[in-house]
């Protein structure tokens, strides 16, 4: 069986078996993401009410910190803003930015009849715009808006 290269150390960061909803959530589908500074890893996990929320953990270990506390839950995969100060996601059928320190949500769009695609919310390299996909009349379309950041 192949093993990691010599000197590579693997560590488990989350121990969630005692939680009401153990483990990271698989819905919405997402990928864990490190901030640009490599000081925080973001992921989705259900809170004690079973609602998918955004959480952060240090790559050095420690307790996960719940970042969002929203009644309806995160609806999509997420991405870090290039500054590492915000995360982009879908919430309440709207594109939103979440402050990575406080968890404050700023909505960037009005509520859409069709929810934006749960695949991803993607920032431009300068962080001034965000793009996403949304279905219109049976076809996925590409959308973009300014972030104000």
Question: Over which residues does each language-model region extend?
Answer:
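Sequence signature of WD/YWTD-type beta-propeller architectures
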Residues: 1-149
């Amino acid at each position: 069986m192949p093993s990691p290269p010599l000197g590579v150390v693997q560590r488990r960061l989350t121990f969630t078996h005692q939680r009401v909803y153990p483990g990271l959530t698989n819905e919405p589908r997402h990928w864990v993401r490190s901030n640009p500074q490599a000081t925080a890893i973001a992921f989705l996990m259900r809170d004690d009410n079973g609602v998918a929320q955004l959480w952060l953990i240090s790559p050095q270990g420690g307790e996960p910190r719940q970042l969002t506390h929203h009644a309806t839950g995160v609806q999509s995969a997420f991405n870090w803003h290039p500054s590492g100060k915000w995360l982009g996601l879908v919430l309440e059928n709207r594109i939103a930015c979440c402050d990575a320190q406080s968890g404050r949500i700023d909505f960037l769009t009005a509520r859409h009849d069709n929810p934006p695609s749960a695949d991803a919310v993607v920032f431009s390299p300068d962080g001034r715009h965000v793009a996403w996909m949304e279905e219109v009349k049976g076809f996925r379309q590409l959308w973009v808006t300014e972030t104000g950041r």
